[in-house]
Amino acid sequence: MPFIFSFMMSALLYSVSYVCLAENISSITPYSSIKAPLANQSLLLDITAVGHHKLIAVGQYGHIIMSADGESWHQSNVPVQSTLTKVYFYNENLGWAVGHDATILHSQDGGVSWAIQLFKPRLEKPFFDIVFKTPLEGIAVGAKGLFYRTIDGGATWNKEYHSEFISPENLLHLSKLKRKDEDAFLDEHSSLSPHFNHLMLDGRTLYLVGEHGLISKSNDFGINWTLLEHIYKGSFYDIIRTLKSKLLVVGLHGHVFRSSKSGTSWTKPDTNTVALINDIVLTDDGRIFLLAADGVLLESNDDGQSYRLKKQTDGKALISGIWFNGQLIVASETGVKIVPL
């Protein structure tokens, strides 16, 4: 059953969240990313398709690269050198990229050019994911409870503090601190919050997974959250819904969990690996690939019930992937790869 904090404990910290307005641009001036001939061979942390004819990948040094086929790449102009961890496109024109230094970038031309919406290096926290419900309503999440929301397409971003993700004993501690020192309360709230690693918008339901076995869902786009059954103490890094409407969540030490009841009960398929699993890729024909550290690639042909190991010979981490024009194209620690299957 979902784990829900008692009304009394939640009320101590406003049962939904504490929200404060944040400045979008830091007083620190960022340096623009440098054009690098081998950017497609450097550390890349995410890759996505923009429509049916374009790929975009992001990674270290603010690199954003684009391709029409997964083989030939060119680099976009980017106004930061911060490592970028995630790229998301709402449609073929509107996109966002997030990363270190609490950076949020926005593109209105399909990724050709980018502008800064948020840059706060003094926070010393990275964003790990971003998703938009409409062209105006979006959420970005990251390390130690980092959670920002926009309702105007990113012209302004508001920071939120969510008490649902903090244990009851720590909620009591925070409630006492809040009465004494507001600034100390906000700092402590962040330090006690888990890392938020990945968001998935599944129809009207928004899922969030992260540190300490966090699996949570929201039916109002992240205003209120319900914690699902605690099935694992380690971190989760991705969650998807399969073509047969099952939930899959993956994380540390080769852990995979599968639910046929939208998270109310779970089974644990055997993966025969202890590698950290970074990403889940679905193909058009229903196959599932899990991308992991140490060159580990897992394939399932039965909707995630069992897996076959297909380890890559170079042993390099497979970090993010996309099924594009019948090929598995992966962002890795050594750049973009088209993985032979």
Feature names for model-found ranges:
Residues 10, 19-20:
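Cleavable N-terminal signal peptides
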Residues 21-341:
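Residue-level hotspots at or immediately adjacent to binding/recognition sites across diverse folds
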Residues 15-17:
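N-terminal signal peptide c-region/cleavage motif recognized by signal peptidases
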Residues 1-8:
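Bacterial N-terminal signal peptides that target proteins for export
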